[in-house]
Regions:
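Paired intracellular helix-loop junctions of major facilitator superfamily
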Residues: 123-125, 179-188
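Helix-loop-helix hairpin linking two adjacent transmembrane segments in secondary transporters
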Residues: 1-29
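C-terminal transmembrane helical hairpin of 12-TM major facilitator-type secondary transporters
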Residues: 125-175
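Helix-to-loop junctions at the C-terminal end of transmembrane segments
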Residues: 111-127, 215-216
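Loop-to-transmembrane helix entry/capping segments in MFS-fold secondary transporters
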Residues: 93-97, 185-195
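Juxtamembrane intracellular "pre-TM" segments in multi-pass secondary transporters
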Residues: 30-64, 88-91
Length: 259
């Protein structure tokens, strides 16, 4: 609304290209296994071998589904929250983009950092806490998201969203780091890609779609407020996510690869 939609692509894309070039010419490729003091075979496992390996790790199965459910809620919000603000609070697209970008970006980044930091702090003594911290975070975010959607004003909705997004992003750093810890060194990149694929298929593929279907179903009863209650229903999936992270933590100690 303020600058035109095309400018957004330049703002997001150009810095990435510059960073990629800088990274290419300044960062040296590390030696595989050097950090762990291990000798790594030159044989690269196939994608199918990595998938079979992960399927035998109970912690990964629960971790992946827990992360996908967390993303399911997150992508549902990102896709439909602007429409929710317009319908329920009468906000304009320009101010929505300004405030929503700040709320999703800054607290989200802080949440990823502190989620990893807290998990590392507690996980040193008991590895199960690497994922149990995420389980607790997911439980906390369920009522926070509910508060976002049930707020009487847009300002209060944004206030609760700050905490919901911050704590809700605790799962990201820990999920990928622990996936790296349960596979062989030569499998790490593919394992991370598989996790991201699962997250996107369920989170990005189904989250926005389910919100829209629920909103249409509830519209005869709630009218323009149907989107509010559709998003509210979606927030309960955080509890389901917490359950899987709890189970993942129980199995993590047995699945981690030690030096």
């Amino acid at each position: 609304e303020f600058f035109g939609w095309r400018l957004a692509f330049f703002v997001v894309g150009v810095p990435g290209l510059l960073i990629a070039l800088l990274f290419r010419f300044t960062v040296k490729e590390p030696i595989r296994g050097a950090a762990e003091g291990r000798v790594v075979s030159d044989d690269q496992p196939t994608v199918l071998e990595t998938i079979k390996y992960l399927l035998n790790k109970k912690s990964f199965l629960h971790l992946a589904f827990g992360a996908a459910l967390a993303a399911f809620v997150g992508y549902g919000l990102i896709s439909w929250f602007p429409s929710f603000l317009q319908r329920s609070y009468g906000m304009q697209t320009g101010e929505i983009g300004t405030y929503l970008g700040l709320v999703l970006g800054i607290p989200g980044g802080i949440g990823i950092f502190f989620g990893g930091y807290i998990a590392d702090y507690l996980g040193v003594k008991d590895s199960r806490w690497y994922l149990w911290t995420v389980a607790i975070a997911m439980l906390i975010t369920a009522p926070l998201y509910a508060s976002v959607y049930l707020s009487s004003t847009a300002n209060m909705s944004f206030f609760w969203l700050i905490f919901a997004v911050g704590i809700g992003n605790f799962y990201q750093a820990t999920s990928f780091s622990q996936t790296q810890g349960i596979v062989e060194i030569r499998m790490r990149s593919v394992a991370a890609a598989i996790l991201l694929f699962i997250i996107n298929i369920i989170g990005l593929g189904l989250g926005p779609q389910v919100v829209g279907i629920l909103s249409d179903y509830l519209r005869p009863t709630y009218g323009n407020e149907s989107l509010r209650y559709s998003l509210l229903i979606l927030s309960t999936f955080k509890i389901w996510s917490a359950y899987h992270y709890y189970l993942a933590g129980k199995h993590l100690k047995n699945d981690l690869i030690t030096n």
